[in-house]
């Protein structure tokens, strides 16, 4: 198994794959920690997404006081991206669920395929957070979170213009990893993510 190979190797690891760690994360982290290995994991290495994630959590804390606002999410990526919703969208959703008492799980909303066909629905229970996904063109990644009430809407968006932000974050993470041990993530690199 991949995780046993990881545990016996004598190198540092980056795993920018959310699905793999959702399935094997606890075991991989345990094997790395027990074996004196270093693992740095993130669903997204972008510096901008890290900042956006902190803003997202803070906004969810504020919105917890205002039940008239419902929250939804959308993510847009290039046509080659197969998973939906994206790992970044799931991570952002988890940040909302941690801070907004009226939501306790995320669900897949609509999915717009590269050919324009739409499946799924944005309809969900009051305790669910809908994440809609769009696949079009060569979009590096757009994530939007919208709080909507009868009076107004509040929307925050991160729009990657290219892959430079991902590369910068990966370099910063690699530099950090070279000086630290254990199971690490973006909240270790950027402590503001822990708030």
Model regions and ranges:
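Rossmann-fold NAD(P)-binding glycine/threonine-rich loop
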Residues: 17-41, 47-61
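Cationic, amphipathic, low-complexity alpha-helical segments enriched
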Residues: 1, 5-18
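Aromatic/hydrophobic pocket-lining residues that form π-stacking "cages" and hydrophobic walls in ligand
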Residues: 1-5, 28, 59, 92
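Short beta-strands and strand-loop turn motifs
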Residues: 16, 40-43, 71-76
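Short loop or secondary-structure boundary microenvironments that flank
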Residues: 17-18, 45, 135, 160
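C-terminal substrate-binding/catalytic lobe of Rossmann-fold NAD(P)-dependent oxidoreductases
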Residues: 65-195
């Amino acid at each position: 198994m991949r995780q046993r190979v990881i545990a016996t190797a004598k190198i540092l690891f980056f795993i920018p794959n959310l699905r793999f760690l959702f399935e094997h994360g606890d075991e991989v982290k345990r094997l790395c920690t027990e074996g004196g290995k270093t693992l740095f994991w993130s669903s997204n290495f972008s510096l901008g997404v890290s900042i956006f994630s902190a803003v997202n959590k803070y906004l969810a804390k504020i919105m917890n006081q205002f039940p008239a606002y419902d929250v939804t999410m959308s993510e847009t990526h290039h046509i080659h991206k197969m998973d939906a919703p994206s790992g970044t969208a799931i991570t952002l959703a988890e940040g909302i669920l941690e801070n907004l008492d009226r939501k306790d799980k995320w669900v897949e909303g609509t999915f717009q395929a590269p050919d324009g066909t739409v499946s799924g629905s944005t309809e969900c229970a009051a305790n669910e957070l809908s994440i809609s996904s769009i696949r079009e063109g060569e979009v590096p990644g757009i994530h939007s979170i919208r709080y909507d009430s009868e009076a107004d809407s509040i929307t925050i968006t991160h729009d990657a213009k290219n892959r430079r932000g991902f590369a910068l974050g990966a370099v910063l993470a690699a530099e950090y990893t070279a000086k630290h041990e254990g199971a690490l993530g973006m909240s270790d690199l950027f402590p503001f993510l822990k708030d």
